[in-house]
């Protein structure tokens, strides 16, 4: 795991000082080493976090054996041992079979030498890779198929191009435009994050997962080397025994190869199904006790520490635990907002930063359980996607919405879930947004100043059209499968994986996600929906598999999620955030919202409408970012 940055531009447009400033912004991603390459129109920078092959010979930028290619690379390719052996066996007696290091980086570069852009199909791992062809004067950038590792890029009309692992590194360039994208603000208020390929800035983009970007003197070309929506065709697996055997075998192998490391490692253990299963399988491959790390809260409604403790005790791990108070969280708020570089509202990032800090005292690599809920239907959103297509909801949806709205505030979310125009709504996105208690478009139109409403209307039409295009041809898929695909493509990548990457890298540790192993993802996409939710049990295959290692009474309980008691804290210890960022002066300064509507929302929240907490938090996060950065 590392931090990378680079430029491709007319000589002199980007200065060496620019890219060095970017490198300073990435220091936390790679405190173990620094490397720089410059030639004609190209500059490449690398900050190293040493995980595999700690020798300086494995440092980057790394050149190919003949000097034609230069690479900077962030991530890990877990099957590098097998790939290296394949190269050696296939090229015995040639320079291609000779390696100077034991690193995965050299294997990645050698594969590119042999296969060109097609090399990426061989890689099982997480990565953001940049390779410069000195002969053809071309820059190739690749992002892994699940979007685990981040990569941002900038371009202008004159052909100047720059990239970096984090947004803050690109905004360190003085010559890069930092004009805010209003559509990204609308996106944020709908989702709580800004989805790929957008960022908060107009001319800076996230490179989408499974994508290759080719930059040359003649321009930029972008193409997909792996597309999620193309992986769901064909016959589905519905034999439970067969699925469980395959799942056990593939996940066991995924955990095994992701434990490859030359530095100490451990596991984030929440006590939930996914992290417990990863921990159980990891204990089969370690000598001695495995380090596990968890976070708890004093508020018992949000405290899962006892469950993590029970799993750790059963599996015999060396368990580390930290109980979070509101004061611990307050001390992190400013850092939390700054780490993500753009508006971001997932407050589970705060406990993730705290558990990362705890882990960093003991290890340099952690395994985490992201991906299980999205691949195996673990959320309430998947249940709602089924309900909304069945009686009585599909027949009496509108009157039921009106009825639920008249009831107490605890039913407001159900009322909003049922309220949508089927001709203008991409249902999976609507379900996700309302399940998160976020704004629907009618609420946004009522909240925004009149001068922004026409722009919002145009955005809502583009929004629906974009989703319809992305998921075209999948309308006949089960509703829960479509929900899963949406959540893999957007919330998983741009919220959860972003959260884990920034939180861990802030403390210079590497997070790995075995449930997003290439082979496991392919298997999960082939499993029939009827097996993922069976007998009313979400994530049925994962729970059946976990029962082989951990007693069901430890893990069979309602899902809570890795969240903080935000609604309570915003009324007590964190009330100052509402006072500081949602007062009349700030609302007027930002110039997006009607003051009377924001005040009304705050009054309702204090009067008992707790469901408004996430909307208020989004406004706080947005206002805070705009005030600080504009």
Predicted region positions:
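A mobile, often basic/glycine-rich helix-loop segment
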Residues: 376-401
């Amino acid at each position: 795991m590392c931090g990378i940055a680079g430029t491709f531009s007319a000589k002199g447009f980007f200065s060496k000082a620019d890219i060095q400033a970017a490198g300073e912004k990435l220091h936390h991603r790679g405190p173990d080493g620094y490397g720089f390459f410059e030639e004609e129109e190209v500059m490449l920078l690398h900050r190293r976090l040493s995980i595999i092959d700690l020798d300086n010979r494995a440092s980057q930028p790394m050149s190919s054996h003949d000097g034609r290619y230069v690479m900077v690379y962030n991530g890990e390719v877990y099957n590098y041992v097998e790939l290296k052996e394949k190269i050696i066996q296939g090229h015995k007696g040639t320079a291609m079979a000779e390696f100077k290091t034991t690193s995965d980086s050299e294997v990645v570069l050698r594969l590119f030498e042999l296969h060109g852009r097609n090399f990426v199909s061989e890689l099982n791992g997480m990565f953001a890779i940049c390779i410069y062809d000195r002969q053809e004067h071309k820059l190739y950038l690749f992002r892994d198929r699940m979007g685990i590792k981040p990569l941002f890029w900038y371009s202008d009309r004159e052909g100047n191009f720059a990239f970096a692992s984090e947004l803050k590194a690109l905004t360190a360039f003085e010559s890069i435009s930092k004009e805010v994208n209003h559509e990204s603000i609308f996106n944020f208020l709908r989702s709580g994050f800004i989805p790929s390929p957008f960022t908060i800035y107009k001319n800076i983009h996230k490179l989408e997962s499974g994508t290759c970007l080719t930059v040359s003197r003649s321009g930029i070309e972008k193409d997909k080397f792996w597309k999620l929506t193309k992986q769901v065709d064909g016959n589905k697996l519905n034999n439970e025994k067969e699925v469980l055997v395959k799942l056990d075998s593939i996940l066991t192998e995924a955990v095994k190869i992701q434990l490859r490391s030359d530095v100490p490692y451990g596991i984030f253990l929440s006590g939930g199904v996914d992290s417990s299963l990863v921990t159980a399988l990891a204990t089969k491959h370690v000598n001695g006790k495995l380090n596990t790390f968890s976070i708890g809260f004093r508020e018992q409604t949000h405290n899962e520490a006892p469950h993590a403790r029970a799993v750790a005790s059963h599996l015999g791990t060396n368990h580390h635990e930290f109980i979070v108070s509101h004061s611990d969280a307050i001390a992190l708020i400013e850092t939390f907002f700054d780490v993500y570089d753009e508006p971001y509202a997932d407050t589970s990032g705060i406990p993730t930063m705290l558990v990362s800090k705890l882990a960093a005292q003991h290890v340099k690599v952690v395994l985490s359980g992201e991906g299980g809920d999205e691949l195996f239907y673990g959320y309430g959103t998947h249940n709602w996607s089924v309900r909304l297509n069945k009686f009585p909801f599909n027949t009496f949806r509108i009157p039921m919405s009106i009825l639920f709205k008249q009831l107490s505030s605890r039913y407001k979310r159900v009322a909003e879930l049922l309220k949508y125009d089927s001709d203008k709504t991409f249902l999976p996105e609507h379900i996700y947004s309302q399940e998160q208690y976020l704004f629907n478009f009618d609420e946004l139109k009522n909240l925004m100043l009149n001068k922004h409403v026409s722009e919002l209307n145009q955005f809502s039409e583009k929004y629906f059209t974009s989703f319809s295009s992305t998921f075209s041809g999948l309308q006949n898929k089960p509703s829960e499968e479509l929900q899963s695909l949406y959540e893999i493509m957007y919330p998983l990548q741009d919220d959860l994986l972003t959260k884990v990457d920034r939180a861990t890298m802030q403390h210079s540790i590497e997070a790995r996600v075995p449930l997003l192993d290439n082979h496991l993802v392919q298997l999960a996409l082939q499993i029939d929906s009827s097996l993922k939710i069976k007998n009313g049990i979400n994530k049925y295959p994962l729970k059946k598999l976990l029962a082989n290692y951990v007693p069901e009474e430890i893990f069979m309980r309602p899902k809570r999620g890795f969240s903080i008691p935000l609604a309570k804290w915003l009324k007590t210890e964190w009330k100052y955030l509402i006072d500081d960022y949602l007062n009349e002066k700030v609302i007027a300064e930002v110039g997006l919202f009607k003051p009377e509507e924001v005040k009304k929302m705050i009054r309702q929240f204090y009067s008992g409408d707790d469901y408004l907490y996430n909307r208020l938090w989004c406004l706080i996060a947005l206002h805070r970012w705009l005030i600080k950065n504009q």
